[in-house]
A protein has these predicted regions:
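Active-site clefts of carbohydrate-active enzymes
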Residues: 234-250, 327-329, 366-367, 372-373, ...
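Active-site-adjacent substrate/metal-binding segments within catalytic domains
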Residues: 67-216, 231-278, 330-333, 337-338
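Glycoside hydrolase catalytic-domain groove-lining segments
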Residues: 334-349, 353-415
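Aromatic- and acidic-residue-enriched segments that line the glycan-binding/catalytic groove
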Residues: 209-246, 276-280, 284-321
């Protein structure tokens, strides 16, 4: 059975919208929030005094167990300052879940409950293979770390040096050397529960590997990101289909795509990551535009002016095979799945030829594609982990169509 694990974007921190909570005069001076984990060592710290007071207890609708919680009201905006318009939503924090009582209240207790990868040492241990892998246990998919411990990846993306004079001055003042920078970063991140790095650590991946080699008991996991489509375009001297990078996915129909994936994975770009036990896996691209709310991929490819463009030829051939003239959402979903299948298949088959233990984390699906059955089906067929950039939502969605789709021989409901 194909192994898969759904990975939320919250595990790979990327961006935070502008947020404003309740004003000071809205707070109840007599309100006493519950205990939460904040402390260092074996000392429990006080709860921050400036958090907003929650509202009355309500049922959290998506909860399978009808759990109660006390919402806090959050004003947010995706606009850049100065902000003239705010949206308001209720959201949750763990401390305000009714009945929540933390089992671990101190840093010392936390450190005793996890290993060097941040994996649980209290949950049932699995086979230790020396590499990360996925495994389905009692109906739930897990990551298993190289030591055989069940693992929930918690990592920070974009760990890299800034380029401004202010960045450089601050870095030199506090760290001065790469060794101190990464050892300090690893320690400080691990103390708040983050044990790895994600995408976009440009210029830092090799430094992390040097740190890991020198500090085997306190590594940072890696999940390097690549740009397969743009690299393929550049190395083959192609243009984007129709001259637009929105159509980058159409490059999979161009001559040499699968062969190029083979050579790229066997080349210098991947050499340092193959068989490295601290590499969780890799992302081959980021947020591929398989469609958006305002732009369907099938429409875009059919609008390409050149009738010889391989992306246009593929789209036209698809429509001809259906015997139709007009694009529908259903046809677009099916065609997007064909494009995604061609993309993911080539990457996965290339991975298997060089390191069959290296997890393929997909392409950080974002926006419309994560709701498209054809795209998700293709990703589930070839990716070991389906990575989702889950933005613009204050709470998880339970009643999403993904729960009822079939991917491979098991339903998504079994895999989420």
């Amino acid at each position: 059975m194909k192994k898969i694990f759904i990975l939320g974007a919250l595990l790979f921190i990327t961006s935070i919208p502008m947020v404003s909570c309740t004003d000071d005069d809205d707070k109840d001076p007599n309100f006493m929030p519950p205990d939460i984990v904040m402390g260092g060592g074996d000392v429990e710290s006080e709860y921050p005094e400036d958090l907003p007071v929650p509202g009355a207890s309500v049922v959290y609708a998506p909860s399978l167990n009808a759990n109660m919680y006390r919402p806090i009201s959050v004003k947010y905006s995706s606009a850049y300052p100065p902000i003239s318009s705010w949206k308001t939503e209720n959201t949750r924090i763990i401390a305000y879940m009714d009945g929540y009582k933390p089992a671990i209240k101190t840093l010392k207790a936390y450190q005793e409950s996890v290993n060097k990868y941040g994996s649980s040492t209290t949950l049932p241990k699995q086979a230790a293979t020396g590499r990360f892998y996925t495994k389905k246990i009692d109906g739930r998919w897990w990551l298993v770390d190289p030591e055989g411990c069940l693992h929930l990846e918690r990592s920070a993306t974009s760990l890299r040096k800034g380029t401004s004079s202010r960045n450089k001055a601050a870095w030199n003042s506090r760290f001065g050397t790469d060794e101190k920078w990464l050892s300090t970063t690893q320690r400080e991140l691990s103390e708040i529960g983050f044990h790895g790095t994600g995408a976009f650590c440009t210029g830092t991946y090799s430094l992390i590997q040097i740190h890991n080699a020198s500090n085997p008991s306190s590594p940072l996991t890696l999940a390097p990101s690549f740009a397969f489509l743009s690299q393929f375009k550049s190395e083959k001297s192609y243009n984007y289909p129709g001259g637009s990078d929105d159509n980058a996915a159409g490059l999979v129909f161009y001559n040499g795509w699968a062969e190029w994936c083979d050579s790229y994975l066997a080349g210098s770009a991947f050499a340092d990551y193959l068989r490295d036990p601290n590499v969780l896996g890799f992302f081959s691209d980021n947020e591929i535009n398989f469609s958006s709310n305002s732009s369907r991929i099938l429409d875009r490819f059919l609008a390409i002016n050149s009738s010889n463009d391989p992306a246009y030829v593929a789209a036209k051939g698809f429509m001809d095979s259906k015997g139709v003239q007009s694009v529908t959402d259903a046809l677009n979903n099916e065609f997007a799945g064909i494009v995604a299948e061609k993309y993911y298949k080539a990457v996965k088959e290339a991975v298997m030829k060089v390191d069959d233990k290296l997890l393929y984390l997909g392409t950080r699906l974002h926006g419309t594609p994560k709701y498209m059955e054809g795209v998700m089906r293709a990703a589930g067929k070839y990716c070991d982990v389906i990575s989702i950039n889950y933005y613009s939502r204050w709470s998880p969605e339970l009643t999403t169509a993904i729960a009822d789709w079939e991917i491979g021989r098991a339903s998504c409901r079994e895999r989420v």
